[in-house]
Every structure is written in structure tokens, then in C-alpha cells.
Amino acid sequence: MGKEALLNLYRIEYRPKDTTFTVFKPTHEIQKEKLNKVRWRVFLQTGLPTFRREDEFWCAGKVEKDTLYLTLSNGEIVELKRVGEEEFRGFQNERECQELFRDFLTKTKVKDKFISDFYKKFRDKITVQGKNRKIALIPEVNEKVLKSEEGYFLLHLDLKFRIQPFETLQTLLERNDFNPKRIRVKPIGIDFVGRVQDVFKAKEKGEEFFRLCMERSTHKSSKKAWEELLKNRELREKAFLVVLEKGYTYPATILKPVLTYENLEDEERNEVADIVRMEPGKRLNLIRYILRRYVKALRDYGWYISPEEERAKGKLNFKDTVLDAKGKNTKVITNLRKFLELCRPFVKKDVLSVEIISVSVYKKLEWRKEEFLKELINFLKNKGIKLKIKGKSLILAQTREEAKEKLIPVINKIKDVDLVIVFLEEYPKVDPYKSFLLYDFVKRELLKKMIPSQVILNRTLKNENLKFVLLNVAEQVLAKTGNIPYKLKEIEGKVDAFVGIDISRITRDGKTVNAVAFTKIFNSKGELVRYYLTSYPAFGEKLTEKAIGDVFSLLEKLGFKKGSKIVVHRDGRLYRDEVAAFKKYGELYGYSLELLEIIKRNNPRFFSNEKFIKGYFYKLSEDSVILATYNQVYEGTHQPIKVRKVYGELPVEVLCSQILSLTLMNYSSFQPIKLPATVHYSDKITKLMLRGIEPIKKEGDIMYWL
């Protein structure tokens, strides 16, 4: 691994000696969402790796049976008839190749053997001992088949770690200190992760239920667990059963919660990060080792995998200059700290009325807070903004609960201010599943009044040099009060507006009850023009036509005229119905549209010793690109985004250059961000909304989420 940028993508071919496949077809139409479940059961029953081609199931080899009867987990029986034998002449798409490849991995157990060997060898190194528990980092090998621009298949092979406690969900539920609703869990011995929808006691069900579950189970671990529950009445008295969102039911004894960084204590989080954020060279060597094991195990079955990584196709140029209100500009290479010290913001409000709240256990840091406020006032004064302190409140509290009780009357009295600055104590960490966070409470209560807040943790004031904290806070104060720290000098191509749109599902009691489309509209200078929240009954992950229509109505209201070029960034997949609605309203309002999907997770990685890799790209097709959007300033391996143009006229390279420019628009820190401003913070906004933190007014131009 040198200066060039490699990707964990490997050319893959399937050239079996025996090209005979047995083809089965259902006697009745199968619902689309059940097709993969049926395919999996065809593989289990025949023992032959299988892929699906439309409504046919192709088995790699000869099957003598004329009819297959497959029982799904819900008890439904699917009948397949043998159509005959066909000669395999190649895959028609990536999915077919991926399905067959994964079945061969299961058949040879090469993947399971690697994970088992790795865990045994490095168990001590990938186990984290917290204060009250042990945490295991379980290796996960992920495979996905993609297609290159040239038309050959590529194996995307990656290694990650799943964070989970040693205890099963059953143990945690027995202790009654864990709310499992909506958490992700993984069944032991099953390559699947799902979200918890419901939990109930096993004793509520009769023996017939357990017998049917045992018979329908397709994995040894779950079949054994159901068998034990069927035989042991005492076990059923205390056992919990868990229903996942996709309808699967499992005994809690074989489920392990999948933790996130938010679920970890600080010391746990740091230790986990040291392991998970693996040095790029080390990660690549491990991937190569896994690949060699795959090659050896699958060679005799006709699989040929190149040992060579694919290489980046080139490096995109982009407009990387920002400017201030006086026309001073700078090229952003690493960060914006020096520019922020000297720049003159675009001032929309030059006098800010501010309320100060200080929450502490003791008074000893109050002098430090006063010192910090003086520096903040002077800093903003030099920027042309007067900070006018309307009032101050000091709250001394020994616990989070006491602090909340004392905060309520203070917050209730606040009105007619532009911002509330809150110095906040960090009380002992709580379980986020069952306790409130003081930060959430403050943010939520002030947003009910449509007042933005700036929270400063008391511990940050213990730093000897407050300049870093001061700059960061000042930048956010500007953005939260409608003032603009800086703008883009220019951007590639002619664009009038960028629209970032995402959908989050709001859950109550484990059930999705409504969805919120979050829209952010930016002008060609990267300046936020408006955010807009629209809520409607949930229909999976899709945007409704009404939500899309609202975006166009808002664009017109904001003054974007017919003929305007509108570039839409969808955080995630654009569905066919969504594309049709965008095109319909684009024509209706007379806008020229570019529709892009931005996929931020589970993409191939770039590996390079070069620090400045922002702009490297790999084209999967004429309209699909893997794009490096930041330089190697962080630990760990670079995680690029995937950009796919779904509709429009501009070349995907121009659209990617625009994305690179929009990564400079970050008002919450000095570093450019991984995602363009259009979709950056989508995850945070969603999490805030799930915790009840959202503005009363669903439309505005204040970045309350910073």
C-alpha cells in the first residue's frame, strides 16, 4: 500500500466445471418480500447453493425431486415445481452472483471458521473490561457483489467488529434493568441482525407454539433453543420471547444486544475505538488474509477471485475556497481554524440578547465561566456583533434530578432572547434506555419556545487554553442566531439550490407510528436558506408524494423561479415512486432537476498512505461513484460515500465536485465534514427527534441541531 489509493474490491468470476443447474418455479405467485426466504430454504432443503432469477430458483447441480415443499417461519407452505435443467451461461446481475457466492461460503463454512479462529486467537485483545461488565468485539466479515463500469463483477470484502455484551438478552431482562424496545439484536449462530419490536413471556404460549417454532426453524441454535423450551415447563416460566421488526420470533436466550458507542461508558468507548478504528494497513492485511482463505476454499467449486485490489480511477478537482463578508478568502486544505479567527461573518443580526444559565455541583468554576464569557463577548464584538446579557442564573445541584427541578422555573421565565448559553454539569452516566439526559431536557424545553441554545460542558472549561473552545462556541453561536460565518466562493456548474432530504421513523412503544421528512435547502454559496419538517403516517422508508410536493411549494415560496437548477441529495435510496413524484413536480414548477442518492455506510474503503486523498473516486457505472470526501486527518481507514445519479443531465463528476465543496460548510467544528451540508447531521437530527428534541415551528433558518 503506497501513495496510490486501493479499494477492497476484487474481481470475481464463477466458472464451474459442471454448468448444469436445476431450475424450480413456484406453483403460485410469491410475495416479493418472501422471495429471499424461499431461496434460502431451497438451498437448505437441496443442499445446493441457489440463486434467484425473477421467479425461478437455480440450484447449482442436479436435483432429483420434482416438487419442493418449503415451510416459512409463519407456517405458510410454498410449493415449487421442477422446471428442468438449464446450462449456466453467466449471471444477469450482481444479486444473482452474490446469492450464489454467499451460499457457497455457508456450504464450505470458510467464513464461520475464520471468525471462530480469529476470536479464539485474539479473544483477550478484543475483550473490553468495563466497570460492571465485559464487552466483546465480535469480528464480522461482510461480502457484497458490485459491478464495475467495464461490466465485470467485483467482490467487496470488509472486516468490521460488532460490539455486544457477554450477557444474553434473557439475562438482562431478568435483571429488569434494560428496555429492549427498538434495540438491535443478533441471534447466536445466525448471520442476521434485527430490531426488537415486542417482548413477552414464554409461559403465555402453549406447547403447540413451541413445537411449530422448532419445526420451522432453519438454524441449529434457534431449533435447539425452541426444543429446550418445548421440553422444559420450568424454563418457560421465566423465559422471554422476542419479536423482531421483520416478524421473526426468537427466545431471548439466544439473542445478544448489539451496542453502539452511545451505549458505552467513556472508558469503554475509548478502548473500543482503539480496537475498531484499525490502522489502514493492518485492516487491509486482514482482508487479504480472509481473501486467501476464501480463494483456497472456493477454487474447486469454480470461483476465481483476483488477489489484486482495484485502484482509484483518478482524483476530482473541486472548488475549495470559502470567503467572508469583506471578500477575504482562503483555500481549505485541512481546517478552518485560522480563517475563523480572522474572518468577518455575514451579519444578519448585530445585537444578540442572551440569557446565561450555569448548572454546577460547586461554585469553584464560576470564575472560569465569567472569564470565558468576557472572551466570547470581546471575540464577537470584533466580528461586529454585540452580545447583550439579559440575565444570569446559577443552579447548584448534587444530582441530575435536582438540577432538572431547579431548571424548570428558570427556563419557564425566559422569553424574548436570541440565545441561551448553558454551562452544564456532567452527572454520572445514565442508561440512555431508561433515564433522561439533562442536555436533552434543556434543548427540548428551549426549542418549545423556539429559542436556540448553546450548551458548554463544565469540564471543557478546565482546559488551560480556552481558545479552541471559544472559537468552536463562537462559530456555533453565529450559525444558531442566523449569522453566517462564511460562504463558498463558487461551486462547480450552474446551480440555484441544493436540497437535502431524509426520512426518519418515529417509534412509540416499539411501533413505527409516523415518519418525518427533514428537508434542508441551501443556495449555491452553501448557505442554509430554510429547513422544513413534515410529518405524515409511516410507509416504510419512502417519502410520500405530499412530502415531495411540499418541497417544491417551499422552493417557489422562497423565490426560486422557473428554469432554476435544483440538485436534490437524498440521504439513502431514492425509490421509484419518489423519482416519479420529483419528476412530476419538477415539470409542474418548471425546475431543472438533478436527483442523487448519497449512501454513507457500508461502502468499499480507500486504502492509501497519502494523507490528502479527498477527491479520489472509483466509477461503478456512468452514474455511480465511490467518492473520498475527506482527507486522512482521523484515525482508522477512510470510509467514502457512494453517489448515484438517478435522474438529470449533469455528469456525475460535476455533481461529485459539488458534494466535495459542500463538505466545507461545517459550522460546528473547524474540520471539513465527510458528508455535504445537505445531508450532514441527518443522523443527529433523527436521534434528537426520537428523543423529543425538535422545534415547535416546522420551518425556519436557524441551525438548531448544531
Curated annotation (Swiss-Prot):
Swiss-Prot/TrEMBL cofactor(s): Mg(2+)
This protein's UniProt keywords: DNA-binding, Endonuclease, Hydrolase, Manganese, Metal-binding, Nuclease, RNA-binding
Residues at the catalytic site: 502, 541, 571, 683
One annotated GO molecular function: RNA endonuclease activity
Domain spans labelled PAZ: 168-259
Biotechnology remark: Can be used for genome editing.
UniProt region (Linker L2), positions on chain: 263-334
Taxonomy, superkingdom: Bacteria
PROSITE patterns linked to this entry: PAZ, PIWI
Region (Mid domain): 335-448
Binding annotation for Mn(2+) 1: 502, 571
Residue positions binding Mn(2+) 2: 502, 683
Residues covered by region (N-terminal domain): 1-108
Chain intervals for the UniProt region annotation (PIWI domain): 449-706
Domain Piwi: start-end pairs: 419-694
Cofactor-binding details, from the entry: Mg(2+) is the preferred cation for DNA-guided cleavage while Mn(2+) supports both DNA- and RNA-guided cleavage of an RNA target. Ca(2+), which is found in the structure, does not support cleavage. Cleavage probaby requires 2 divalent metal cations.
Domain notes: Has 4 domains; N-terminal, PAZ, Mid and PIWI. The N-terminal and PAZ domain are joined by linker 1, the PAZ and Mid domain are joined by linker 2. The domains assemble in 2 lobes; the PAZ lobe consists of the N-terminal, L1, PAZ and L2 domains, while the PIWI lobe has the Mid and PIWI domains. The PIWI box is exposed on the surface of the protein. The PIWI domain assumes an RNase H fold and has the catalytic residues. The N-terminal and PAZ domains are relatively mobile and move further apart when in complex with RNA.
Protein name (Swiss-Prot/TrEMBL): Protein argonaute
Organism this protein belongs to: Aquifex aeolicus (strain VF5)
